[in-house]
């Protein structure tokens, strides 16, 4: 590890500890040249697929963009920040576990809607109206009809 003080490449690890609920390892190091101490952190690299947009563009998976969309859909609804974070965690985990290099934005949108459908129907309809780009009230009513039909015993 390169010393942040003198740039020397050799050091020794003095102490290692797990941190952040076991997701991070904190290491105290001492430079072999200047003998100053510094701290480094190690974590598993998240390998998330690239998102392929409807127009063919490719973007890195952006968890914050996902959370923003969920917050907008859930605005003024009885949905907690923890519930929004749990949905984002689940979708991110599903994307990681798919082990695919690319994922379609439409697939992510469908996953969001599946989670919102069970959490809050109003948030679901809000998200669907933007995601599916309803052009008129008839398309909106068709989606509401599907929701009502799925809810009926």
UniProtKB/Swiss-Prot annotation:
PROSITE patterns assigned: ATP_CONE
A Pfam family assignment: ATP-cone
Domain ATP-cone: 49-139
A GO MF label: ATP binding
Needed co-factor(s): Zn(2+)
Zinc finger (unnamed): 3-34
Disulfide bond entries: none
Cofactor remark: Binds 1 zinc ion.
Sorted UniProt keywords: ATP-binding, DNA-binding, Metal-binding, Nucleotide-binding, Repressor, Transcription, Transcription regulation, Zinc, Zinc-finger
One biological process term in Gene Ontology: negative regulation of DNA-templated transcription
NCBIfam families with a match to the protein in the record: transcriptional regulator NrdR (TIGR00244)
Function: Negatively regulates transcription of bacterial ribonucleotide reductase nrd genes and operons by binding to NrdR-boxes.
Recorded family membership: Belongs to the NrdR family.
UniProt xrefs under PANTHER family: TRANSCRIPTIONAL REPRESSOR NRDR
Protein name (record): Transcriptional repressor NrdR
Organism per entry: Sorangium cellulosum (strain So ce56) (Polyangium cellulosum (strain So ce56))
Lineage, broadest ranks: Bacteria, Pseudomonadati, Myxococcota, Polyangia, Polyangiales
């Amino acid at each position: 590890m390169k010393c942040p003080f003198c740039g020397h490449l050799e050091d020794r690890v003095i102490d290692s500890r797990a941190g952040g609920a076991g997701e991070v390892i904190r290491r105290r190091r001492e430079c072999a040249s200047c003998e100053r101490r510094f701290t480094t952190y190690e974590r598993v690299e998240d390998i998330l697929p690239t998102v392929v947009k409807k127009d063919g563009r490719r973007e890195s998976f952006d968890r914050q963009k996902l959370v923003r969309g969920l917050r907008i859909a859930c605005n003024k609804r009885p949905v907690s920040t923890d519930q929004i974070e749990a949905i984002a965690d689940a979708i991110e985990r599903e994307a990681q576990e798919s082990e695919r290099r690319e994922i379609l934005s439409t697939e992510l949108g469908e996953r969001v809607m599946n989670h919102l459908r069970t959490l809050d129907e109003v948030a679901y309809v809000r998200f669907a109206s933007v995601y599916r780009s309803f052009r008129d009230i008839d398309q909106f009513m068709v989606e509401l009809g599907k929701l009502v039909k799925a809810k009926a015993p």
